[in-house]
Amino acid sequence: MAKPLTDQEKRRQISIRGIVGVENVAELKKGFNRHLHFTLVKDRNVATPRDYFFALAHTVRDHLVGRWIRTQQYYYEKCPKRVYYLSLEFYMGRTLQNTMINLGLQNACDEAIYQLGLDMEELEEIEEDAGLGNGGLGRLAACFLDSMATLGLAAYGYGIRYEYGIFNQKIRDGWQIEEADDWLRHGNPWEKARPEFMLPVHFYGRVEHTEAGTKWTDTQVVLALPYDTPVPGYLNNTVNTMRLWSARAPNDFNLRDFNVGDYIQAVLDRNLAENISRVLYPNDNFFEGKELRLKQEYFVVAATLQDVIRRFKASKFDSSNSTKTAFDAFPDQVAIQLNDTHPSLAIPELMRIFVDIEKLPWSKAWEITQKTFAYTNHTVLPEALERWPVELVEKLLPRHLQIIYEINQKHLDKIAALFPKDVDRLRRMSLIEEEGGKRINMAHLCIVGSHAVNGVAKIHSDIVKTQVFKDFSELEPDKFQNKTNGITPRRWLLLCNPGLAELIAEKIGEDYVKDLSQLTKLNSFLGDDIFLREISNVKQENKLKFSQFLEKEYKVKINPSSMFDVQVKRIHEYKRQLLNCLHVVTMYNRIKKDPKKLFVPRTVIIGGKAAPGYYMAKLIIKLITSVAEVVNNDPVVGSKLKLIFLENYRVSLAEKVIPATDLSEQISTAGTEASGTGNMKFMLNGALTIGTMDGANVEMAEEAGEENLFIFGMRIEDVAALDKKGYEAKEYYEALPELKLAIDQIDKGFFSPKQPDLFKDLVNMLFYHDRFKVFADYEAYVKCQEKVSQLYMNPKAWNIMVLKNIAASGKFSSDRTIKEYARDIWNMEPSDIKISLSSDPSGGANKANGK
């Protein structure tokens, strides 16, 4: 049960969390009881904790509704340019606490729930994560929605309402087992179905060329039913919309065309159409060319573009004008951002609408299309790039294939004119790859069809320009940009680490929440011993809290005064959880060799999901759990070293582990992690980073000073040089006794005595086809880890470094990222107007910092 706050604690919780007025609390209690009674049809005698959660969620939602309606009215009145963020993933996590914070209701709700005799934290834990994403790409989309609303941009997130999100991970006998994530089982209080905006989406069929133009006919129709979720900005009364599409079979499905009397079977077959939005594909950084996935990609695109055009035509903007000239204004009113290539079919689909339906000439349609779209690239791993078989696209989307061919022809004509006789260049730059079966290179389609292409960190954008899409950036250098990723400080500081957020606010005020660059002001407190101790105390409280959580949920006991060394992210060879694992084995061997020697106690925590079909990633999990089994049960080791595999890592678990972390592991092979955003979350929450010069680590080192991160290992040039020379893993194995010992133990069954050859495939990979060169960085990594332990023994020096990192993390707010997208790509202006809640039709508004 929550304890009441003392007056001092209440004073410390400055208005970051909202003012608590008596009438405010009474109003919330009234709303809560009303919903319990009228919405849930329960009284306090029979209500369950879940009922209480839903009553609270509906009460908080009531405070969103007026602002939501008002925001949409305001956009209609003012007719600003709108941005549409298209993504197959939105990894939102939980909504309740984020909504309370952004509406300034958290303290009042806490008080109301306390007065009702309930425990706020217990209620928050009941909410299911909306796990509609795999990892970084989907979570980035969620952070971006928060920032776009906070910056007052007229923005819409468009995606799919998957019935089943990312699988729940269970560990059984050390192996990952997947379970379906039935996240909607109890209902979702935040969404509103909008059947009145249901739209048809077409598949298959054939193309007819007639006098009147081209027609796509004899198609199968699936209906797209939109569900809207409110996205509140931080204390600015703006509430934007995330619209997710659900697939529905039309009522005449399988009945109209061949009514052979099997009515029951026809109704049962409706499932086939509705499977489109059934489940999220659980691949991170890997392309799997399945027909159902292609259907998902087209489904979201086709429904969204109809909606965008409907809204454009209904807007007050130039509504007197006739269609043809009206579409000239389309790119002035609409920006569409493609989150990776997954929604790339939006390019041929918009062309199809303009040319076949709106009857625009090709050149005009293409000009508008290019001005409308922009593309974000998220990965340079070749196995992740989408390349759809022509044959599959021809079957599913015959008209789109024709349009893609036409786009390609005009594109290649242009190149041939610029580079006559350079046949190889034509082959490299074509949208169609010929070798090994014809495939469409979706990244090439996005580059050609967009006016801007961006990478997600400086180093990644450089690789995109100079290596992956070199030919394209030589052709149009101005098209290529960098937009370093960011994270929302609302969720990733205020929500998950209120103690630290309040400590910072006491020193520099509250404005940093909307302008994270103000964190540099903390540098003036580097000499303030009391402040350093307070920061350290907050970390210790978070570690204690997380230890208690681990003990309660996972039945694991850990030493809260040990260093918490954490690597949480998708399990992938390029992220090198194996390198971390080898370090754990090495520490274990050192303790065993000399148990009396001083050893800085560590709890190593590794968490993350492996794609269900990714054999090596699953074997890596089994290795981690097997090493943990040995290390954690060795009496000689005791509490000096523990290895925990954190089961079912997800957004709500990240919010618990990140504030408790001392050391953040960001150890991908240089040149493989596009940006990373977990690295930023740890930095903002007072962890130090051990990492390679990869992704955003490079810019973190630039902001904080390289001496304030633990940087080790090969740089991008070193990796290239090693590739050129030829990477021989055996050489490192022979030269480094501790590495040899660790590998031999894994190989000979020390960690799997019942199955001595359990890890032979893994060891074989490390020796003969390790693309990510684990052995090459082993020695530097272990040495760097020794430096970490050294510093940890000097708490004051450690805390100074922590404060320097927090003070340098301001650049990594997604607010900064979105301002750059708005300025450099979308041609939109953020607004600090606070929408007024009176519904006076003039769209009355005032500055957010005033009334």
Swiss-Prot record:
Record-listed AMP binding positions: 43-45, 76, 310
Positions of modified residues (N6-(pyridoxal phosphate)lysine): 681
Activity regulation comment: Allosterically regulated through the non-covalent binding of metabolites, being activated by AMP and inhibited by ATP, ADP, and glucose-6-phosphate. The activity is also controlled by post-translational modifications including phosphorylation and acetylation.
Residue(s) carrying Phosphoserine: 15, 524, 561, 639
Annotated keywords: Acetylation, Allosteric enzyme, Carbohydrate metabolism, Cytoplasm, Glycogen metabolism, Glycosyltransferase, Nucleotide-binding, Phosphoprotein, Pyridoxal phosphate, Transferase
InterPro entries, per database record: Glycg_phsphrylas, Glyco_trans_35, Pyridoxal_P_attach_site
Site feature (Involved in the association of subunits) residues: 109, 143
Post-translational modification (record): Acetylation, which is up-regulated by glucose and insulin and down-regulated by glucagon, inhibits the glycogen phosphorylase activity by promoting PPP1R3B-mediated recruitment of phosphatase PP1 and Ser-15 dephosphorylation. Phosphorylation at Ser-15 converts inactive phosphorylase b into active phosphorylase a. Dephosphorylation of Ser-15 by phosphatase PP1 inactivates the enzyme.
Residues recorded with modification N6-acetyllysine: 470, 796
Highest taxon in the source lineage: Eukaryota
Name this polypeptide is given: Glycogen phosphorylase, liver form
Biological source species: Bos taurus (Bovine)
